[in-house]
Amino acid sequence: MKIGIGIPNQGSDLDPKIIPEWSRRAEAAGFSSLATAGRIAYPGVMDTVALAAAAGATSTIELFSGVLIGPAWPATLLAKELAGVDGVSGGRLTLGIGLGGRADDFVVDGLPMNGLGQRLDDDLQTYFDVWDGKEFEGSPNPGVPAGARRLPLLFGGAAPATFERAARVGEGYVGAAVPAPYVAPAFDQMRTAWKQAGRDGDPQLRAIAYFAMGDPEVARRKVEEYYAVTPEFGQAVLTGIAYGPEGVRELLRSFEDIGTDELILNPSTADLDEIERLAEVAL
């Protein structure tokens, strides 16, 4: 199982200037990927901006959006922006994408929180058209440079359509930031959908969890603040935070047991020292 680390781009105590340094340290420590959190109505840094900063500060580590709220964006603009991040990184971006579950994140006029599944399916076709270099409507020009590619896609969510969509156009699935026993049934659903779609091999199965090597009370408060708008789900997230070295080791075992290909460990605070502390235990 590979071990990635989250960028604290949505931490309420975030100084945005640390994102490049966080990214450099994570790459040097040997983590497999750097992942962002997707949120708009929160005092953080947009995931696309954090990914761009990480792309410029690193050279080998994978970049992952875990997960970006697709239908909250105008599809053409998002596709172009992501192609730019991927290009700057040298082709290291994997797009984790989902529908979104918080009404306050839908801030763009004309893009409300309804009809999200159909909108995402329509948006995906727009992404592919942009990434394939098709001309924009009313223009003789494509929106991306030559050499742009279709980004690998992983989908997050719990609706049956999520797994069908992932099996149809994606590379796999990313679970929510809850304990492994809650994620295991979703992994099983993804494996089943993959086989039913006639796909070869196995889907990528990624998971997300929070860790804290420092003060557990501070960590818990920060995570609780972030999920305050969805308190029932937030309680499930809180039960899965790994505290200290032994907590992290136990967390790793639990996700290995359910067949996780990569576990993204999200920091509970924006303390740069957490990177090395985690690496000593998890890598």
Which ranges hold each PLM region?
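Active-site-adjacent structural elements that line small-molecule/cofactor binding pockets in enzymes
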Residues: M1-L283
